[in-house]
Amino acid sequence: MSKKVEVNKVVVAYSGGLDTSVIIPWLKENYNCEVIAFVADVGQGEEELEGIEAKAIASGATECYVVDLKEEMVSEYIFPTLKTGALYEGKYLLGTSMARPIIAKAQVEVARNVGADALCHGCTGKGNDQIRFEGAFAALAPDLHVIAPWREWDLVSREECLDYLAERNIPCTASLTKIYSRDANAWHISTEGGVLEETWNAPNDDCWAWTVDPEQAPNESETISLKVEKGAVVAVDGKAMTPYEVVVYLNEKGAKHGVGRIDIVENRLVGMKSRGCYETPGGTIINEALRAVEQLVLDKTSFEFREELGIKASHLVYDGRWFTPLCKSILAASEELAKDVNGEVVIKLYKGHATVIQKRSDNSLYSEEFATFGADEVYDQSHAEGFIRLYSLSSRIRALNSK
């Protein structure tokens, strides 16, 4: 966006960190506009949110709105995505990606409520988040201007940002040295930068924030029971919980046993690769439980289709295409497939592993009578001959034609 565009009131996605603390006064100076701070509570922790309104006002914001999005994020964004089986590039449970559309949606709602004519985010010009936010803004509020300071200003270092605030007597608790870049919400925490920028470096202990080292985890395993209804975990160990409560509870259980760690080099949407240490303890447990019930209740073609949905959904969510017809269609299809995904799963947690050890479902298609190798009381093996001849017919014809 050009600086020549005139705006009167801007709603900025504010985190309380160094970048967004600089953005508020920068917006006022460069756009001569009123700045409203919007804070999304997505479960990043009380420590991150403590005193954040006062900090935003001290930076120059007229008002600061803190919006609790935790329950909605898990129930309306994370759990529906889980039903698709989405794992970006086979490993990543999309912790950061799934939080962005609801943050953008809530930011637009605040902008509408206060009569703002512009939106602002603090994403850099190298990452995925700029695309996720601006893609959501385009779908939800195409009439609002979007300001991306990192693509406009000439500040290039933490030192320059700190100097910028000091020159304006704006208080800031950030330090000059920041080893890692972290992003946390109720679902996961990511750690990037520092030693991780060299792929040959093994992660340090401080690359992990939530989970214990699996080698240092308890020597005694722990089992938990999860009740699944329509592709969502609704109770743990016999206690009914909301989706958010399920995630919080299982995060604590999984972290204690070192569950949910991945060290991944992923393909960013902008073309470059990035490395990060991601922790999703509760999500890893939930994903194992859902896939276990699916094994019982989905027939072969439904299971294959659900896998295809998962791959496509992972890219749509990662690429910031949540508010698109295709994403809505995939979520609707997975919702239909999940109608029979009901059951109970027992998972053993032990030194970094979440292992399914028991599973059952009233909708199970598994039949012990059909699967055993005993007497043919319910399955006549001679019937297989005709099926095989038809199944291999195209191969037979191709072979005959080649002679």
Curated annotation (Swiss-Prot):
Describe the reaction catalysed, as an equation: L-citrulline + L-aspartate + ATP = 2-(N(omega)-L-arginino)succinate + AMP + diphosphate + H(+)
EC number(s) in its UniProt entry? 6.3.4.5
Q: Annotated pathway, please?
A: Amino-acid biosynthesis; L-arginine biosynthesis; L-arginine from L-ornithine and carbamoyl phosphate: step 2/3
Q: Where does L-citrulline bind?
A: 92, 97, 128, 132, 181, 190, 266, 278
Kindly state which keywords UniProt assigns to this record, in alphabetical order.
Answer: Amino-acid biosynthesis, Arginine biosynthesis, ATP-binding, Cytoplasm, Ligase, Nucleotide-binding
**Where is it localised?**
Cytoplasm
Domain of life here? Bacteria
Q: Name one GO molecular function term.
A: ATP binding
Q: How does it assemble?
A: Homotetramer.
Write down what this protein is called: Argininosuccinate synthase
Species this protein is from? Aliivibrio fischeri (strain ATCC 700601 / ES114) (Vibrio fischeri)
From the broadest rank down, the organism's phylogenetic lineage runs: Bacteria, Pseudomonadati, Pseudomonadota, Gammaproteobacteria, Vibrionales
